[in-house]
């Protein structure tokens, strides 16, 4: 053994002794090289994300204009985690969560941890405590724009507080990012959009909270309404585009189109018809949709209703779509497979 190798081995032993086993290793020795994910609640979004859902142990930013469906997207993720037996938390800085709507999306509100903090510092400290516990699979913060620093709340209405929120987010994310990775918690930050003053060329839109969240996020999703979905003169929902503007775990810039129906959330039937037609799993002839020898209905809304009533056919089409995109047919196991080890790593 060379002197260099002996010196390296000694340094590695010293690091492990000081910081604990697993604090340094060769990349190929990592026990889990494949990215563990949780389904997003939308098949189209799972495909657009490229890995079959939201990656565990990462920060996700979901932003867009008002009433575009950002909270709906986050609530679907919570419902998926709960269905797999995981623990979810919702930090409602906007004080606007509708429990009835959440329940309709499949969220178990009896088990959902909810916090409605008074200040931005309080919200982020609660998020950090939940992440460091190693027992929470997903934490949603709604929204970054509503994380008001304590100094601003205690000050007068006309006081200037330049850069306070950006500094708060930067400090919080520096502390949170390592703990999120070790505990394999998914942290979803919902954000609004603002317009920069005096921008003549390029996109004037930006997100509040400074640049830190843009850097620390592994995935950034832009949610925008594309068009209204009508039945006669009644508006039933919106066709919504979700663009993956940043992705560190798969190629970015893919787009998912989903129907967000009022009072129902993302329409699984709608996206299965759209994806199925795109992949030629579902055949479209004129206005008629059919699958193999089975006619699904005339017009998209009738085909959606048919799939809603015939779950067996819906599942068969869904299975073929998942197979095409290479998505797991089953969900990922809850994050804490070895809670003791995760807790030990968090406390070193």
Swiss-Prot record:
ATP binds at residues 64-71. Keywords: ATP-binding, Cytoplasm, DNA damage, DNA recombination, DNA repair, DNA-binding, Nucleotide-binding, SOS response. One of its GO terms (biological process) is DNA recombination. SMART domains: AAA. Belongs to the RecA family. Residues 328-348 are annotated as: Disordered. This is Protein RecA. PROSITE patterns: RECA_1, RECA_2, RECA_3. Can catalyze the hydrolysis of ATP in the presence of single-stranded DNA, the ATP-dependent uptake of single-stranded DNA by duplex DNA, and the ATP-dependent hybridization of homologous single-stranded DNAs. It interacts with LexA causing its activation and leading to its autocatalytic cleavage. GO terms for molecular function: ATP binding; ATP hydrolysis activity; ATP-dependent DNA damage sensor activity; damaged DNA binding; single-stranded DNA binding. InterPro entries: AAA+_ATPase, DNA_recomb/repair_RecA, DNA_recomb/repair_RecA_CS, P-loop_NTPase, RecA-like_C, RecA-like_N, RecA_ATP-bd, RecA_C_sf. GO terms for cellular component: cytosol. HAMAP family: RecA. Gene3D superfamilies: P-loop containing nucleotide triphosphate hydrolases (3.40.50.300). Its main location: cytoplasm. It is found in: Cytoplasm. Pfam families: RecA, RecA_C. PANTHER family: MITOCHONDRIAL DNA REPAIR PROTEIN RECA HOMOLOG-RELATED, RECA. It comes from Bacillus licheniformis (strain ATCC 14580 / DSM 13 / JCM 2505 / CCUG 7422 / NBRC 12200 / NCIMB 9375 / NCTC 10341 / NRRL NRS-1264 / Gibson 46). NCBIfam families: tigrfam_recA. The gene is recA. Residues 336-348 have a biased composition (Acidic residues).
């Amino acid at each position: 053994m060379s002197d260099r190798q002996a010196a390296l081995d000694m340094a590695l032993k010293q690091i492990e002794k000081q910081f604990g086993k697993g604090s340094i290793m060769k990349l190929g020795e990592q026990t889990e090289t494949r990215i563990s994910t949780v389904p997003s609640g939308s098949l189209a979004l799972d495909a657009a994300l490229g890995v079959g859902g939201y990656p565990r142990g990462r920060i996700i930013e979901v932003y867009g204009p008002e009433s575009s469906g950002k909270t709906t997207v986050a609530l679907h993720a919570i419902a998926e985690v709960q269905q797999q037996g995981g623990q979810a938390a919702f930090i409602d800085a906007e004080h606007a969560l509708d429990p009835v709507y959440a329940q309709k999306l499949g969220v178990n509100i009896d088990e959902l941890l909810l916090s409605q903090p008074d200040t931005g510092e309080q919200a982020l400290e609660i998020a950090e405590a939940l992440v460091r516990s190693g027992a929470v699979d997903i934490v949603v913060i709604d929204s970054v724009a509503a994380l008001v620093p304590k100094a601003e709340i205690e000050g007068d209405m006309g006081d200037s507080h330049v850069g306070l929120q950006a500094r708060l987010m930067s400090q919080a994310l520096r502390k949170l990012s390592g703990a999120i990775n070790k505990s394999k918690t998914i942290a979803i930050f919902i954000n609004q959009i603002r317009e920069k003053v005096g921008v003549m060329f390029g996109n004037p839109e930006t997100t509040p909270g400074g640049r830190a969240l843009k850097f620390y996020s592994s995935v950034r999703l832009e949610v925008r309404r594309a068009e209204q979905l009508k039945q006669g003169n009644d508006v039933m929902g919106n066709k919504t585009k979700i663009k993956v503007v940043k992705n560190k775990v798969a190629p970015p810039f893919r787009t998912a189109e989903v129907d967000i129906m009022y009072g129902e959330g993302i329409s699984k039937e709608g996206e299965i018809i759209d994806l199925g037609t795109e992949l030629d799993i579902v055949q479209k002839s004129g206005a008629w949709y059919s699958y193999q020898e089975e006619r699904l209905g005339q017009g998209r809304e009738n085909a959606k209703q048919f799939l809603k009533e015939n779950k067996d056919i819906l599942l068969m089409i869904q299975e073929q779509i998942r197979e095409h995109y290479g998505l797991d047919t089953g969900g990922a196991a809850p994050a804490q497979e070895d809670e003791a080890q995760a807790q030990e790593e968090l406390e070193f």
